[in-house]
Amino acid sequence: MVNVPKTRKTYCKGKACRKHSQHKVTQYKAGKASLYAQGKRRYDRKQSGFGGQTKQIFHKKAKTTKKVVLRLECMSCKTKTQLALKRCKHFELGGEKKQKGQALQF
């Protein structure tokens, strides 16, 4: 389980800052795929009409997790950067901090 705080003080590459400043942390989420990208237009054209499936569908998935990507937004200059973490099964943003000597909570 990875628990990341909602704010973090880190270096900002923005032209206005170029120093360590407070950043707002969110989890990156992929946008919706465009219908007008060249590959999608070609695929749809090829699929239309008779003849069934024209390109192979990938089935041999090897990975069980995805790498978590953090989106860091500088609170002073609003510059956004992305930071990739290691793979993990459980990711939590802004969860409760663990206390020393406490009983495990399930």
From Swiss-Prot:
Q: Which GO terms describe its cellular component?
A: ribonucleoprotein complex; ribosome
Q: State the Pfam families in the record.
A: Ribosomal_L44
Q: List the molecular function annotations (GO) for this entry.
A: structural constituent of ribosome
Q: Where do transmembrane segments lie in this chain?
A: none
Picking any one GO biological process from the record gives: translation
Would I find Iron among this entry's keywords? no
Q: Has the keyword Ribonucleoprotein been applied to this entry?
A: yes
Q: Which domain of life is it from?
A: Eukaryota
Listed A to Z, the keywords are: Antibiotic resistance, Cycloheximide resistance, Ribonucleoprotein, Ribosomal protein
Q: Where is the signal peptide?
A: none
Give the family this protein belongs to, as stated in its UniProt record.
Belongs to the eukaryotic ribosomal protein eL42 family.
Q: What else is known?
A: Confers resistance to cycloheximide, an inhibitor of polypeptide elongation.
Q: What is this protein called?
A: Large ribosomal subunit protein eL42
| Organism per entry | Kluyveromyces marxianus
| Name of the gene | RPL44
